[in-house]
């Protein structure tokens, strides 16, 4: 059985690392290069790096910072934020990044996924979905760092992304972001069991037990977390960590 992955998810804002709660209240937690050096030592599976301002502010990716990060990273990187064209993706790949995560741009022009996949392969494209539960209980997809309701169901959009050519889906629960009270297992399983590409679940990890619970209750392929690997203790002191994934009793 293929071991399921455990992936740190780092958020970039103004060249610094931040952590949010429900996509709000970004708190500075350190320098990205220092964090990556620590994760190198801990031999993490891979790394997801998301610029939370780029798409919302209609900015291009920060290629200089991406190059610095890629130069330090010993593990595969997935980068997202501000990628709106094939040329943006091509530039990022040329800097040594293995995957790009496309979110808002795909909602504006789904053909971007196919163009990137056709040129670089589906394995290089991750379709990112930010979703929030509505008043009546259903979930809706949001764009522009969770500020715009696209009035689409996460499952419908996940299937559209799969058909367009993504190699993976990154499913991020806005409601659970930074709360550290467990994943929305029902949401994750609904998506993971109805698409044929790997799904990475993000949003809610507060303990190793939460990771194990998600893996045991769903068919998700990987889990991503931020707060779990950045904060320590009830006062949320900044302390970068990573579990011994070989001790996670899951396949």
UniProtKB/Swiss-Prot annotation:
Annotated catalytic residues: 130
Residues spanning the membrane: none
BP GO annotations: L-histidine biosynthetic process; O antigen biosynthetic process
Signal peptide from the UniProt entry: none
Compartments (UniProt record): Cytoplasm
Class of this enzyme: lyase
Keywords: Amino-acid biosynthesis, Cytoplasm, Histidine biosynthesis, Lyase
Reactions it catalyzes: 5-[(5-phospho-1-deoxy-D-ribulos-1-ylimino)methylamino]-1-(5-phospho-beta-D-ribosyl)imidazole-4-carboxamide + L-glutamine = D-erythro-1-(imidazol-4-yl)glycerol 3-phosphate + 5-amino-1-(5-phospho-beta-D-ribosyl)imidazole-4-carboxamide + L-glutamate + H(+)
UniProt pathway annotation: Amino-acid biosynthesis; L-histidine biosynthesis; L-histidine from 5-phospho-alpha-D-ribose 1-diphosphate: step 5/9
EC number: 4.3.2.10
Effect of residue 22 to R: In strain: Serotype O16
GO molecular function terms listed in the Swiss-Prot or TrEMBL record: imidazoleglycerol-phosphate synthase activity; oxo-acid-lyase activity
Cellular component GO terms, alphabetical: cytoplasm
A Pfam family the protein falls into: His_biosynth
Alphabetized InterPro entries for the sequence: Aldolase_TIM, Glycosyl_amidation-assoc_WbuZ, His_biosynth, HisF, IGPS_HisA/HisF, RibuloseP-bd_barrel
Subunit and partners: Heterodimer of HisH and HisF.
Function recorded in the entry: IGPS catalyzes the conversion of PRFAR and glutamine to IGP, AICAR and glutamate. The HisF subunit catalyzes the cyclization activity that produces IGP and AICAR from PRFAR using the ammonia provided by the HisH subunit.
Family membership: Belongs to the HisA/HisF family.
UniProt name for this protein: Putative imidazole glycerol phosphate synthase subunit hisF2
